[in-house]
C-alpha cells in the first residue's frame, strides 16, 4: 500500500485555508499597492479556474448552496506542485489553467509567492491572513530544500506527527485547526487512512466591515425568499437606501451589485432573473468580471439583502480527478521534489467553508452607531434591488484582483 498525503483546505467565516511553497530564490518584498502585471495575469487564470470548479460543484450538488475559496484551492495545489515532478506536476498546473509554454513553472511559483505575500500585506480595518501547517510523519524524510522553503518563505508551521497512532494524529491536527480558527471549526478531520504520512492544512482568516453598514433597526425579521417556483423560506432582510455600484446586464439577464468593505475588499452579488441562473453560471469567466468592472455605475439604490450564514464541505478528490489531476492520486505519482521516499501519492483533498453576512459585515459583532448619509427625497425614482431569490456571491481582494470566496445561495436558511 502506498503512503498517503492528505491535503486539507479549510475556509471559515470568511475564513479559509491555503498552502503554498516557494520557488527558487528568496522572497522579494511585496508592495500590495504596486501594480503587478504577473499578479493581474494570474488573477484572470485563477478566476477562470474558480468558475470551472464552481460549475463542477453545480453538477455534483444541483440546487444546493455552494461556497468555497478559489484562491485557497489554487494556492494549495500550486504548493503541492512544488513537490511534484514530471507529469504529476504538469497535470496539477494545467488543471489550474496554466500553460507551461506561455507561463513557465518558475513564473507560476514566483507569482503565487507574491500573491500570498500581497494578500498578507497589512491593511487597516481589514483582517486577511493566510496560514499554513504541515504535519509530517516521523518516518518521512522530506527534502531539506522543500522543508526550508515552506518554513522560511511561507512561514509554515511544521509538526512531527506519529501517524501510526491515527486517533492521536487526528486529535493533534484537529486541535491545531480549532485553535487557529478560534473555535470555528471543530473535528475537521474525521478519518485518516492508516498509511497517511503527511497532512497539509491551510487556512485564510478574513474579516471585514461594510463600508456602509446596515442599521439593524431596519432589518425585517421575516421576509420571503424564493427557493424555486413553488417554495419560499423566511429570512431576516436587511434594508438601506445608499449609493452603490450596480448594473443590469441585459445580455446575461442579471443584476450585479457591488458592496464595498471598508478597506480593499468587495462583494459582488449577482442576481439572475427568474429561470436564468444556469445561463449566468455558464457565462461566468474572468472576461465577464472585467466587463462588469467597466460597466458598473454608482447611484442610489433601495437595497434589500438577506442576513444569513451558510457552510459547505467538499471532498475534492473525485472533482480534481475529473478536472485532470490524475497522476497525483495514482501509484505512478511523482513527488520526488518533496521526498526521496518512493510511492507517495495524494489521498484526499478536503475543503470546508463557512460564511456569515450581517449588518456590520462578515461576522456578527456589536454594531456601532450607523452614520447615515444624506438620502434623496424622491426614493421612488431610484432602482430597487431586492435579493429575494437564488444569487451568486463573489468576495474579492482589490490589490490582487483575487476571488477570495465564490458561492451560490439557493437557500439562506440552510446553515
From Swiss-Prot:
Its main location: secreted. InterPro entries: Serpin_CS, Serpin_dom, Serpin_fam, Serpin_sf, Serpin_sf_1, Serpin_sf_2. GO terms for biological process: thyroid hormone transport. PROSITE patterns: SERPIN. GO terms for cellular component: extracellular space. Pfam families: Serpin (PF00079). The keyword Secreted applies. It is found in: Secreted. SMART domains: SERPIN. GO terms for molecular function: serine-type endopeptidase inhibitor activity. CDD domains: serpinA7_TBG. Glycans are attached at residues 36, 99, 165, 253. The keyword Electron transport does not apply. Keywords: Glycoprotein, Secreted, Signal. Residues 1-20 form the signal peptide. Thyroxine binds at residues 293, 398. Major thyroid hormone transport protein in serum. Belongs to the serpin family. This is Thyroxine-binding globulin. The lineage of its organism: Eukaryota, Metazoa, Chordata, Craniata, Vertebrata.
Amino acid at each position: 500500500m502506498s503512503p498517503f498525503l492528505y491535503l486539507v483546505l479549510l475556509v471559515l467565516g470568511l475564513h479559509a485555508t491555503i498552502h503554498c511553497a516557494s520557488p527558487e530564490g528568496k522572497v522579494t518584498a511585496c508592495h500590495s499597492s504596486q501594480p503587478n502585471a504577473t499578479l493581474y495575469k494570474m488573477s484572470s487564470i485563477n478566476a477562470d479556474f474558480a468558475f470551472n470548479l464552481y460549475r463542477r460543484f453545480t453538477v455534483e450538488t444541483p440546487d444546493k448552496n455552494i461556497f468555497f475559496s478559489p484562491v485557497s484551492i489554487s494556492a494549495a495545489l500550486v504548493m503541492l506542485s512544488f513537490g511534484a515532478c514530471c507529469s504529476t506536476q504538469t497535470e496539477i498546473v494545467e488543471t489550474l489553467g496554466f500553460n507551461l509554454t506561455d507561463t513557465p513553472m518558475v513564473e507560476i511559483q514566483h507569482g503565487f509567492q507574491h500573491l500570498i505575500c500581497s494578500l498578507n500585506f497589512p491593511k487597516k480595518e481589514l483582517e486577511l491572513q493566510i496560514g499554513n501547517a504541515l504535519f509530517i510523519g516521523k518516518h518521512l524524510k522530506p527534502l531539506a530544500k522543500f522543508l526550508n522553503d515552506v518554513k522560511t518563505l511561507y512561514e509554515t508551521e511544521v509538526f512531527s506527527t506519529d501517524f501510526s497512532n491515527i486517533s492521536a494524529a487526528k486529535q493533534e491536527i484537529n486541535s491545531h485547526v480549532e485553535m487557529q480558527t478560534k473555535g470555528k471549526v471543530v473535528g475537521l478531520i474525521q478519518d485518516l487512512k492508516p498509511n497517511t504520512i503527511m497532512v497539509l492544512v491551510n487556512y485564510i482568516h478574513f474579516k471585514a466591515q461594510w463600508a456602509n453598514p446596515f442599521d439593524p433597526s431596519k432589518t425585517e425579521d421575516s421576509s420571503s425568499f424564493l427557493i424555486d417556483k413553488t417554495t419560499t423560506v423566511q429570512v431576516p432582510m436587511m434594508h438601506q437606501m445608499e449609493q452603490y455600484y450596480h448594473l443590469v446586464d441585459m445580455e446575461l439577464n442579471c443584476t450585479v451589485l457591488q458592496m464595498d468593505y471598508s478597506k480593499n475588499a468587495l462583494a459582488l452579488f449577482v442576481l439572475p432573473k427568474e429561470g436564468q441562473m444556469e445561463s449566468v453560471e455558464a457565462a461566468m469567466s474572468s472576461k465577464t468580471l472585467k466587463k462588469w468592472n467597466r460597466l458598473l455605475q454608482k447611484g442610489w439604490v433601495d437595497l434589500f439583502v438577506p442576513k444569513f450564514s451558510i457552510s459547505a464541505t467538499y471532498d475534492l478528490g473525485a472533482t480534481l480527478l475529473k478536472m485532470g489531476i490524475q497522476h497525483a492520486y495514482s501509484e505512478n505519482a511523482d513527488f520526488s521534489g518533496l521526498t526521496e521516499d518512493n510511492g507517495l501519492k495524494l489521498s484526499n483533498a478536503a475543503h470546508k467553508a463557512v460564511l456569515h453576512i450581517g449588518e456590520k459585515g462578515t461576522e456578527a459583532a456589536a454594531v456601532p452607531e450607523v452614520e447615515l448619509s444624506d438620502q434623496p427625497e424622491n426614493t421612488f425614482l431610484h432602482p430597487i434591488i431586492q435579493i429575494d431569490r437564488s444569487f451568486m456571491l463573489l468576495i474579492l481582494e482589490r490589490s490582487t484582483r483575487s476571488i477570495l470566496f465564490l458561492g451560490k445561495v439557493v437557500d439562506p436558511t440552510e446553515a
